[in-house]
Design a protein with these regions (language model features):
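Short beta-strand-to-loop elements that line the ligand-binding cleft
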Residues: 47-51, 115, 137-148, 186
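Central regulatory/effector-binding core of bacterial HTH transcription factors
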Residues: 16-75, 227-230
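C-terminal effector-binding regulatory domain of bacterial HTH transcription factors
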Residues: 40, 44, 167-176, 186-230
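Short beta-strand->loop
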Residues: 79-82, 176-188
């Protein structure tokens, strides 16, 4: 009985390592404020954060809480939707002054575009756009190609290229008038960000507390989602 009580107390104590995994691309601006707030609340928790764009093995990687963008994650795990993934074609005012704005999807072929190379697969990720009720993949001829989202953002801000950026990344720059959203009627709406985890009954208290904070702070938070007016 004493051993069981000790084990239960250890499980219910909000302390110890917290293994978090998530995508390297597009999610860092959201994740750090959550971790910072959580650690201020619970200073005895030690976050172990692994960011990579591959989909790992939940058991082998000993994950407590995971994040993913795209469609709903693995079967056998609990997944909660957080935010829509807005993929927004953006340009700086300097780019638009020099090259003008594309008025149609087809016009992208005559513009200088950035391309993102998936760090996990090495493949260039096509731009995804909504066309009517369908989603289409739009290949672009890249003027710059990179597997680093920060470098891609820098190239777009500098006025060198158009880029299709995640809304989480682009939103503060659009609101500050440093970037202009283009072809907004073609922003796809199929994908979302998810938090996922195993059975709540088997979770340590630190994982349950972090998930509760994530849901409280992120679910459809307008700070991270641009409205059509914006």
């Amino acid at each position: 009985q004493r051993a069981l009580r000790t084990a239960k107390q250890a499980k219910d104590e909000i302390a110890g390592p917290l293994r978090i995994v998530g995508p390297r691309s597009a999610f860092q601006p959201v994740l750090w404020p959550l971790i910072d707030e959580f650690c201020q609340r619970y200073p005895d928790v030690v976050p172990d954060v692994q960011l990579e764009d591959r989909v790992g093995n939940w058991v082998e990687d000993r994950v407590d809480v995971g994040f993913r963008l795209g469609l709903s994650p693995h079967e056998g795990l609990i997944a909660r939707r957080l935010l829509p993934v807005q993929l927004i074609i953006c340009a700086s005012p300097e780019y638009l002054k020099a090259y003008g704005a594309p008025e149609t999807i087809a016009a992208l072929q005559s513009h200088r575009c950035s391309a993102f190379r998936n760090p996990g697969t090495g493949q260039i990720v096509p731009w995804r756009l909504r066309s009517g009720n369908d989603e289409v993949e739009q290949p672009v001829v890249p003027a710059i190609c990179t597997n680093d989202e920060t470098l891609e953002l820098s190239a777009v801000l500098a006025g060198r290229v158009l880029g299709q950026l995640a809304g989480l990344t682009a939103a503060p720059y659009i609101r500050a008038k440093q970037l202009v959203p283009l072809l907004v009627d073609h922003i796809p709406d199929r994908y979302s960000y998810f938090v996922y985890y195993g059975s709540r009954n088997a979770q340590p208290a630190r994982a349950r507390a972090f998930i509760d904070l994530v849901l409280e702070r992120l679910v459809d938070n307008s700070k991270y989602v641009l409205s059509m007016k914006e």
